């Protein structure tokens, strides 16, 4: 199931996404987030996390980093990589 979902996202990235204007306000893009979430948390939780991310991505949201969290969560991961690296070096 995991491979089927990842393949579906890859097909979207290859065939559909290039025909649409760039719209994702987060890094990584919503489709890459979906793939990472499925690979890290499995098909059920990954699909739920990816869908929640797509619903969060709209013109009125605050753009920025939204990395896939280590633990399952449907909320935005507000930790930015720069801050995380600073904390790790302490």
Curated annotation (Swiss-Prot):
Chief subcellular location:
membrane
Q: Where is the protein found, in the record's own terms? A: Cell membrane
Q: Which GO terms describe its cellular component?
A: plasma membrane
Record keywords: Cell membrane, Membrane
* Signal peptide per UniProt: none
Q: How does it sit in the membrane?
A: Peripheral membrane protein
Has the keyword Cell membrane been applied to this entry?
yes
Name the job this protein performs: Could be involved in insertion of integral membrane proteins into the membrane.
| Family label | Belongs to the UPF0161 family.
Q: Which NCBIfam families match?
A: membrane protein insertion efficiency factor YidD
- The name of this protein is Putative membrane protein insertion efficiency factor
Q: Which species expresses this protein natively?
A: Lactococcus lactis subsp. cremoris (strain MG1363)
Native organism taxonomy: Bacteria, Bacillati, Bacillota, Bacilli, Lactobacillales
């Amino acid at each position: 199931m995991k491979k089927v979902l990842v393949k579906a996202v890859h097909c979207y990235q290859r065939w559909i996404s290039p025909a649409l204007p760039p719209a994702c306000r987060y890094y990584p893009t919503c489709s890459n987030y979906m793939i990472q979430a499925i690979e890290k948390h499995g098909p059920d939780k990954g699909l739920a996390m990816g869908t929640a991310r797509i619903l969060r991505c709209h013109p009125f949201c605050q753009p920025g980093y939204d990395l896939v969290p280590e633990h399952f969560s449907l909320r935005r991961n507000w930790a930015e990589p720069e801050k995380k690296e600073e904390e790790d070096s302490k």
